[in-house]
Amino acid sequence: MNLIEQLEQEEIARLGKTIPEFAPGDTVVVQVKVKEGNRERLQAYEGVVIAKRNRGLNSGFTVRKISSGEGVERTFQTYSPLVASIEVKRRGDVRRAKLYYLRERSGKSARIKEKLVRKEKPVVAA
């Protein structure tokens, strides 16, 4: 590990943010800090993760949602002070790292199957 990577790891540890494991295709709710005048509030932004960029401290992800019939995408920096929290609502079952093809789709064809997590049964010795 070189010096720059080490400094980035120390900075991530100093921030103390707990970022859940999520991947493209997952539906997430991002709580964003919004400043209006002199007060600050949290705004929820829920949508499908269509891209994720893992670059240490410079990591980011893009969330797409349909708002009033119009597609809206927003890119967030994972360790930004404006991102208060990230919550995973459901896991998506996709075979791509970047889901940019969802931009051309609408309605049912833009939906993503849910990933079903199997619980392993304990093996009983006979």
Curated annotation (Swiss-Prot):
Transmembrane segments: none annotated. It holds the Pfam family Ribosomal_L19. InterPro entries: Ribosomal_bL19, Ribosomal_bL19_CS, Ribosomal_bL19_sf, Translation_prot_SH3-like_sf. Keywords: Ribonucleoprotein, Ribosomal protein. The keyword Calcium does not apply. It comes from the Bacteria. One of its GO terms (biological process) is translation. One of its GO terms (cellular component) is cytosolic large ribosomal subunit. GO terms for molecular function: structural constituent of ribosome. This protein is located at the 30S-50S ribosomal subunit interface and may play a role in the structure and function of the aminoacyl-tRNA binding site. NCBIfam families: rplS_bact. Belongs to the bacterial ribosomal protein bL19 family. This is Large ribosomal subunit protein bL19. It comes from Dechloromonas aromatica (strain RCB). The gene is rplS.
